[in-house]
Amino acid sequence: MSIAIIDYGSGNLHSAAKAFERAARSLEDPQKVFVTSDPDQAYGADRLVLPGVGAFADCRRGLDAVNGMVEAITEAVRVKARPMFGICVGMQLFATRGKEHVITQGLNWIGGDVEKITPRDESLKIPHMGWNTLDVLREHPVLNKLPLGPKGQHAYFVHSYHLNAANEADVLARADYGGPVTAIVAKDTAIGTQFHPEKSQRFGLALISNFLRWKP
């Protein structure tokens, strides 16, 4: 089994790779983790990870600049039904559009727009940086046995925008930051988190481990 972390010039590749390697070691079946900017290698992997930090438009341009990568991951996920994990802006790229400064087309795997978060409490700063618990909207195998809810473990967020999904069924969990913030989305074999699981300590590691066990 192999896990490809997509390198398109954005994302905490080293941190993500280390987190997935650590989670993979906890499984009964060995899984190889590798970072790649080669579309053929990405397409050939059993699971894919799309990290991302920075502005939506910059990340989309970076992904488009890797010749054949959008086509490869779209074929792998949407046609071959291989599991994909999006992290932060990597998850946002699943959306129909991003509205950060300019309108930018996303991958359109999950209907909806990436919009600026607008806390009701004006004292809450943007970007949203820090630890939050998650409120689960629906069950999913990747959330199995995780300590969620108001008394659950915390996830680490650093962002100013979130995915406002068109279909409520595509949202697995939200956080509260002066109002609801989309935290986890999933549709078919694609799942993504607005927070950084690689920085979320034991909770993040458990979430990644569940993703690696998931057989959609």
Curated annotation (Swiss-Prot):
MF-aspect GO terms: glutaminase activity; imidazoleglycerol-phosphate synthase activity; lyase activity
Catalytic activity line of the entry: 5-[(5-phospho-1-deoxy-D-ribulos-1-ylimino)methylamino]-1-(5-phospho-beta-D-ribosyl)imidazole-4-carboxamide + L-glutamine = D-erythro-1-(imidazol-4-yl)glycerol 3-phosphate + 5-amino-1-(5-phospho-beta-D-ribosyl)imidazole-4-carboxamide + L-glutamate + H(+); L-glutamine + H2O = L-glutamate + NH4(+)
InterPro entries in alphabetical order: Class_I_gatase-like, GATASE, Imidazole-glycPsynth_HisH
PROSITE patterns in alphabetical order: GATASE_TYPE_1 (PS51273)
Pathway it works in: Amino-acid biosynthesis; L-histidine biosynthesis; L-histidine from 5-phospho-alpha-D-ribose 1-diphosphate: step 5/9
Subunit structure: Heterodimer of HisH and HisF.
Known function: IGPS catalyzes the conversion of PRFAR and glutamine to IGP, AICAR and glutamate. The HisH subunit catalyzes the hydrolysis of glutamine to glutamate and ammonia as part of the synthesis of IGP and AICAR. The resulting ammonia molecule is channeled to the active site of HisF.
Species whose genome carries this gene: Bradyrhizobium diazoefficiens (strain JCM 10833 / BCRC 13528 / IAM 13628 / NBRC 14792 / USDA 110)
Residues annotated as the enzyme's active site: C88, H196, E198
Disulfide bonds: none
EC number(s) recorded for this UniProt protein: 4.3.2.10, 3.5.1.2
HAMAP family named in the record: HisH
GO biological process: L-histidine biosynthetic process
Protein name according to UniProt: Imidazole glycerol phosphate synthase subunit HisH
Localization of this protein: Cytoplasm
Entry keywords, A to Z: Amino-acid biosynthesis, Cytoplasm, Glutamine amidotransferase, Histidine biosynthesis, Hydrolase, Lyase
